[in-house]
Amino acid sequence: IRRYFPNAMIVADRFHVIRLLNQFCLQTYQQIDPEMKYQRGLLAALRTNPNNLTVKRLNRRERYLQQQPVIAAIYYFKQRLHRLLMRKHRTAKQCTRLIPLFLKLVASLKESPFDSLKTLGKTLYQWREEVVRMWRFTKNNGITEGFHRKMKLIQRRAYGFRNFENYRLRVKVLCS
């Protein structure tokens, strides 16, 4: 990449960063409360944006968080980091103000007593420049990933067919 695009800056994909955050937080929740994995509605309530929850799920989540103060602390920390990571279209000056807050949150993750949160903190720290660039630049490779997914589905459906021209035609129809 550096050879062909010497001035290019790598920007982390917001979808993957948020997915990583959710994945490691859910691992920590399940480490604290192993019975949680059998309560699917509760897991969904902890994963879903609070603005998108029904009143019933919101109440269920709040009751659970009152019973589990450690999980509640991690959950509210995750929400704070999530809100910070979801910011878009920031100027360079605004980004400069947000960086210390981001680094402070990452440092507290690295000092966590839970291994999965430590790992998340180390990962975010290693990718800090790419993650911070998300606030300023919003272009990503989501379209390319979508096309690759469609192409894999076509291949799966057409397993055993040998006509490459037919495959190429299907890809052109579905991806244009």
What is each of the regions a protein language model found here?
Residues 1-9, 15-18, 37-176:
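Acidic/histidine-rich catalytic cores and adjacent linkers
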Residues 17-38:
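Short alpha-helix plus adjacent loop in nuclease-associated cores
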